Amino acid sequence: MEITYILKIWWMENLSVDHLLGIKFLNQNDLELIFETADNFKQVINRPIKKVPSLRDITIANLFFENSTRTKLSFELAEKRLSADVLNFSSSQSSVNKGESLIDTVNNILSMKVDMVVIRHSNPGAPQLLSEKVNATIINAGDGAHEHPTQALLDSYSMRQEIGDLRNKNILIVGDIIHSRVALSNIFALQLQGANIKVCGPNTLIPKYLRDFGVKVETNLDKALEWCDVANMLRLQNERMSDSFFPSVREYKKHFGLTMERLDKINKKIVIMHPGPINRGVEITSEVADSNNSIILEQVENGVAIRMAVIYLLAKKNFDRWI
């Protein structure tokens, strides 16, 4: 590594938290520190040699109790770029299916001298429970419909690269808000940065408490698009729906699907985002997802740098790592 890179990382402050459980536990300085660190790691992963020895001899376990493609691979790649030893856990092949509790499962894994745990779980609050009950650094990779902090961090980071400082910028979140951990984490992150936030979707998919957070609500997508600088499109989370929240997918597409025809009606270019997985032809057409307005693949790329930054900063604070 170049000496300038080492000095940049070494002089950085510490996060205010010992775990990453949710954006709601972070402050504005934490966000800026994570983004600045991600800038440094983005330079690293664009070099021919993409690894740094920062987390050598640190072991990280990835515990995913829900399906994941982007997040799981992104965390694993980030950990390996930092030279950590990585364990990948699959709940479908574990003793959880034999009735073992989450705490017992994690404590057994930690007895193998694991230092950090990245967890995705269907139960809201599972990462916080672990942080209180086990002796390891915990990173929340998504807990039910509660939070998905690293997704919100990479989303804000990607927005800033496109439109600069988010203060007073108009950010729109469209779709299934009520079941989305991405939406809630994004709202917390955007509020810390002084952005104006509006959500759009059927009333049945928008939680009423958002208005108490100062979030504006719009049920007309065309009006919302005219207002926004960025539109973050969310999929319908059918796996979390026990009731009928809208008449049909066809009806949903008609009123809330993002098409090029809709974008052509407004007199400005807006940035299009999506956390994935995309249901093409439902919340967004392929033409829009693959257009010059879209930064969906940039979000995925930035996810590695953001997760490297989060992992590194927590290790720096908790294990006295500075290289």
Segments from the language model and where they lie:
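Positively charged, low-complexity intrinsically disordered leader regions
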Residues: W10-L73
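Phosphate/diphosphate ligand-binding glycine-rich loop within oxidoreductases
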Residues: I49-Y157, R280
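Phosphate-coordination loops involved in phosphoryl transfer and adenosine-cofactor binding
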Residues: L55-I60, R167-K169, K269
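Glycine-rich phosphate/diphosphate-binding loop of Rossmann-like nucleotide-binding domains
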Residues: F65-E66, R70-E76, Q161-L234
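Short, structured coil segments at secondary-structure junctions
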Residues: L82, K113, K133-N135, Q193, ...
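Rossmann-like adenosine-cofactor binding region
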Residues: L210-E287
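Adenosine-phosphate binding glycine-rich loop
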Residues: K269-I270, P275-I323
